[in-house]
Amino acid sequence: MKLPSKYLSNLIIANLLWSFIPIVVKNLFSEISILTIIFLRFFISGIILFVIAISLVFVNNYLNHEKRISLKELFLNLRHKNRRFYKIRQYNYYFLIGFFGIILHIFFYFLALKKTSIPFVMIGMLMTIIFISFYEKGVNYEKFDIFRILFIVMLSFSILIITFVSLQGAEIKNDPIELLGFIFLVLYSITSSFLYISIDRDSFSKKELLNININKYYKIPRALIKMAIAFISGVILLIPASILIAFLPFETDITQEVIAFFNELRFIFVILGRWEIIYLIIFATIIPYLLIFLARVNWEPTNLTYSQWSSILGLIDPISTLIFSVLIVNEFFPFEYLIIVIVFLVITIVLRYAHEVKNSIRAKILLKIKRGSLKLISIKILKFYGVREIDSLIGEYDLMLHVKVNSFKDFHYLINRKLKFIDEILDLKVQFVDKIEK
Amino acid sequence: MRAIIMFKLGINVIKKVIEELKAIPEIKKVMSLTGDYDVLAEIEVETSEELFDIFSEKIDLIDGIIASNTHVIMKAWEK
């Protein structure tokens, strides 16, 4: 199999850089508010990513006169309606993923980290993968094949071992894991799942697609601007949200974080100079995102897509965090348990890879539909397992189903047990996809 | 406006036709198929007039295409 090795390494490096985050910030929590850390990381990173995006456009236009990127179009497209995300405008979509996805998931992650331990927080990452799997099963996007069931079992075992060891460590250190820490962890998993599900639901306008076809590097400034707007709008929305929390009649841990945040605003530039904050901005945000976008743009057609590799390699983050937390900051995690968890998580990566490789039958099914039933039938068919998208057509056929299933057995089931039972379908034609060329 | 065009091709021309289709900027997806048709292309244009122009000036001139079947996409649903 041909591997896009050069760009796979981008994903691996990005995940390794992210895995140092909890180690870098854990000791910072006693001195600086979580909100200040988040504010500085994303506000400054947002500005830098924005400047990089604009600079890349100028450099491209200077070096490449024939394939110029229009800055005006880049911004005008923010008003384009995102047909893959409730048809809201792109800028609203960026605000939503910025605040509810990026900012809140990191906020709950840091709160959980503050209340518990680094290994314990890794449970949140593993729970996120399980939540996403159940979501995909719930919307009939993916099926629980043997590989998927096994990797959920492996993840569950890893969660149990990490919980057991973390509770043991807390008892030895006489620093019990609070229930609140676990609640923050669950909230982190929920917001993190929202982020992973929604971040790829981006849609390109007609002009953008044309621009991408002319110059594939158009995607890089576009993605950088997307992240910059998401980061900056997320932290801006954090301020009214913090004020609201400060005025609530009851006091929580979050209230203390908010008060500390407003007090620290006076020393913001001093805090910005700390190496931990600089690491978060440069090595945990700017460089990983640049590596990821570069990989995405240059991804060569292989057995697996960029998104599939990205989800497989996402497990590198919790594995390396666990290892580094034991090696660097001496978190309690006996060696034998560490080996077991690492082996389990590596097996999970292999199972996930096997699942993605196996999940490989793609087809286009063309349907002729009885008059007057087009809309109802489309919505009904979309719920069937394997049907990813439906296009309503004008021409010889009325509908085209974009199908991706695990096996011919599943495909047979879709055709003969589902579609052929619908009276409104007059004719059905199957076209298997050999290769996606563009 | 989006449209899909399915092509029936002659013998031993699939690679050449795919390369020529990929070179058309308005075509955003190209895939090879097994079935009645050999290749499927998805095109994104502003108007039906533009679709006609691209078809008549670019696609129709590609040697090796025996027949094509065009459908305009009215609406799309996605999971």
Label each residue range with its predicted role:
Chain B
Residues 1-79:
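A compositional/biophysical signature of low hydrophobicity enriched in polar/charged and small residues
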